[in-house]
UniProtKB/Swiss-Prot annotation:
The lineage of its organism: Bacteria, Pseudomonadati, Pseudomonadota, Betaproteobacteria, Burkholderiales. It comes from the Bacteria. GO terms for molecular function: ribosome binding; rRNA binding; translation initiation factor activity. SUPFAM superfamilies: Nucleic acid-binding proteins (SSF50249). This is Translation initiation factor IF-1 1. The gene is infA1. Belongs to the IF-1 family. It comes from Burkholderia mallei (strain ATCC 23344).
Amino acid sequence: MAKEELIELDGIVDEVLPDSRYRVTLDNGVVVGAYASGQMRRHRIRILAGDRVTLELSVYDLTKGRINFRHKDERRSDAAPRASARRR
């Protein structure tokens, strides 16, 4: 059986909810509930309110999505680079 087609959309995280869930407003104005993908959880990528994200929606339920990418924030580009941790 072939995997179903997913719809990829961009949006902005409005609110961080309990249990690793998020409320995201898509670029077209629709508000959906979302969760972080397994890769993002495994690599401990933090998602905060105001972050720009890409999510996948199933064609069967357009109210829930999976966040699979957090875009780089242009505002943080002027911050000093993090000092490397030294092992002893």
